[in-house]
């Protein structure tokens, strides 16, 4: 018999494998036929890195002595900088303020005093405007890194404001996706030492010797982000991360199978190792290895039993998906 098995992977796209099952006496031979999707080649494009740190009043307290934020930004941007052809540094609030020095000087100048001198409206932050500004300056060969506590300046009509803000930011990203359908977005949640005023709308409170969350947004072509993640893993950010989520458009999954013909065991099953490159989906390894994320169009015949990392160097694939085929 000749069947086609469609194995949708919910975090990516689909893999289609044709299965031919032939009876050979008491045993059966199963032959798999597939069209390999090649793994992406190493990127040779010229990539422009743009780094934006929000210089608002709510960010001042992160710039205290012993700030984890400054160390993380310095280390992470230094690593990304090696993978790009240029790096531009900015402050951002109501306007974009270019920084003319190098990365070392930029980090040293992450202080409340420098924030105030840089200009713009440091009192109120409109994230809708910030994302609109960043995305409109984000060409197809640009990767933007935005560092912020992402606190909204909420007016009295909070419910109406939050709904409007959510829709506005969604529309901004949808417009960017229309221009660049391969746009990917990563949001990394971290914590830093915090000493100063915490703002919420018109209220504020002085906090001392506490840790507060902040976020790094990485925005750019998902192929670029996938290569960044391979060479500069998000999980290795100094101090560890507190959370991670990402968006990438559906795509073909690069995959191959080591052999095509199998003889079934006594239970009538075969075990197939599927070599796949899942990096382009930008998801965390916890999601990659969660078999609940994988769906078979014919679960009576094909089951995903496990997903394992490929740790060997020089391999273009990221994971091995183990499939059980029933004859």
Name each model-derived stretch.
Residues 180-302:
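Eukaryote-biased recognition of electropositive, low-complexity segments
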Residues 3-50, 55-63:
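Acidic, polar low-complexity linker/tail segments
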């Amino acid at each position: 018999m000749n069947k086609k098995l469609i194995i949708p992977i919910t975090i990516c796209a689909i893999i289609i494998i044709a299965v031919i099952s032939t009876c050979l006496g008491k045993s059966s031979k199963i032959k798999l036929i597939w069209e390999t999707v090649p793994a992406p080649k190493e990127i040779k494009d010229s990539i422009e890195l743009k780094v934006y740190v929000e210089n608002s009043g709510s960010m001042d307290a992160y710039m205290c002595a012993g700030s984890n934020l400054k160390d993380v930004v310095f280390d992470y941007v230094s690593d990304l900088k090696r993978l790009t052809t240029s790096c531009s540094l900015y402050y951002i609030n109501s306007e974009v303020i270019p920084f003319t020095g190098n990365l070392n000087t930029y980090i040293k100048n992450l202080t409340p005093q420098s924030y105030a001198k840089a200009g713009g409206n440091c009192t109120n932050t409109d994230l809708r405007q910030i994302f609109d500004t960043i995305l409109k300056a984000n060409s197809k060969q640009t990767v933007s890194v935005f560092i912020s506590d992402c606190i909204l300046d909420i007016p009295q009509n909070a419910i109406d404001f939050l709904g409007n803000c959510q829709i506005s930011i969604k529309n901004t990203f949808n417009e960017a996706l229309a221009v660049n359908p391969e746009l990917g977005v990563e949001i990394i949640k971290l914590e830093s030492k915090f000493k100063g005023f915490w703002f919420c709308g018109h209220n504020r409170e002085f906090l001392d010797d506490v840790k507060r969350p902040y976020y790094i947004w990485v925005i750019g072509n998902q192929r670029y982000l996938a290569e960044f993640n391979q060479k500069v893993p998000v999980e290795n950010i100094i101090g560890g991360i507190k959370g991670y989520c990402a968006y990438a458009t559906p795509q073909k999954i690069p995959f191959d199978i080591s052999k095509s013909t199998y003889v079934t065991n006594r239970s009538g099953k075969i075990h197939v190792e599927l070599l796949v490159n899942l990096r382009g989906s930008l998801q965390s390894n916890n999601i990659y290895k969660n078999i609940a994320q994988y769906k078979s169009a014919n679960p009576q015949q094909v089951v995903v039993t496990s997903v394992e990392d490929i740790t060997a160097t020089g391999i273009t694939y990221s994971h091995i998906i183990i499939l059980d085929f029933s004859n």
